[in-house]
From Swiss-Prot:
FABPs are thought to play a role in the intracellular transport of long-chain fatty acids and their acyl-CoA esters. FABP2 is probably involved in triglyceride-rich lipoprotein synthesis. Binds saturated long-chain fatty acids with a high affinity, but binds with a lower affinity to unsaturated long-chain fatty acids. FABP2 may also help maintain energy homeostasis by functioning as a lipid sensor. InterPro entries: Calycin, FABP2, Fatty_acid-bd, ILBP, Lipocln_cytosolic_FA-bd_dom. Forms a beta-barrel structure that accommodates the hydrophobic ligand in its interior. Its main location: cytoplasm. It is found in: Cytoplasm. Hexadecanoate binds at W83, R107. The keyword Cytoplasm applies. Tetradecanoate binds at W83, R107. The modification N-acetylalanine is found at A2. It comes from the Eukaryota. This is Fatty acid-binding protein, intestinal.
Amino acid sequence: MAFDGTWKVDRNENYEKFMEKMGINVMKRKLGAHDNLKLTITQDGNKFTVKESSNFRNIDVVFELGVNFPYSLADGTELTGAWTIEGNKLIGKFTRVDNGKELIAVREVSGNELIQTYTYEGVEAKRFFKKE
C-alpha cells in the first residue's frame, strides 16, 4: 500500500491554530510544532501498525480498519474512533472522550509526501511528511 514506509515531518500548515482550538496550552503548542515526528507505517491486509517517534514519546499504534479503538494524543487528550479507507485516503474519525467533539484525520500520499490533515471545530491543519 502507498502508506507503507517511514515518514518524517517536514513542515506544518496552521498546526498551532489547530492545537489552540484543541485547548493545548501555548508552551505545548510551541513544542508540538517542532516535535520531529516520524511515522513508520506498515499494513497487513486490514491491519495497520504505526510507530510514532517524536521528541515527546515513542509508541506503537495498532488498529484494524473500521474497528473502534482508544488513542491518546501526545498531550494526553483521550480519543476513541476508527480508521477507514476511502479511495486513496486513510480517514480517521475520532471522538474526544472529555467533551464528545469530533476530530477528523486524513492521511494521503502524493508523490514522496504523506499529507496528514486534521479538522477540529472548523479549524483545519496540515502536516507534511517526506518519505525516508
